[in-house]
Amino acid sequence: TVKERSAVVRFKVVGEDAYFLAWTTTPWTLPSNVALCVNPSDTYCKVKSVDGYVYYMAEALLDKVLGKLAEEDKPAYEVLETYKGTDLEGKSYVALYECAAKEAEKQHKKAHYVICDDYVTMSDGTGIVHIAPAFGEDDARVGREYDLPLVKFVDEKGCMTAETPFAGMRAKPSKAEMEKDPNVKSADPEVLKDLDAKGLLFDAPKFEHDYPHCW
């Protein structure tokens, strides 16, 4: 098992002073994000958080994600509205990275909106999953269903491409590689740093998982 940092990211809702909170275990895939996925039949809430932001996320995970923000005299959040996942389908958000918006335009495909699929679970994260169809089976499947653009900002060597602000950094260097060459730069911490500087990183919790190292 590998201990890594995941990311809970703020995606700005178009036309609203609010954000979708989405979780990913692979921050290096975020520049290739083209959609956010919710479970169609689960309940989602729009909440005013004590941190001053308005968030959309799954009702079942509110306390797990926002609970730690609670102050002595203030609850962590106040529920403003409640939705079914299907109510959020089609809602647009601002692309995290300009490169993905440009690539979607080039492919003449709609991107950066909410889609629905049953594979989204309420066991961890925020109940909203970031979708990059070039990476991951479920992402690829829902990408085909919604005809999302295929955006892949990682080359065959596993390096981030020049379109991104992380050109040349390794998307997923193995531990052995990192030890062998101290100059190998992993994209994950840099993506987290960049999002943090933009005020878009809500949290970067550590987690453990098994990771197959292959391209």
Residue ranges, per PLM feature:
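Residue patterns forming the tRNA-binding/recognition surfaces of aminoacyl-tRNA synthetases
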Residues: 1-31, 43-45, 90, 99, ...
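Protease-associated
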Residues: 35, 42-128, 137-141
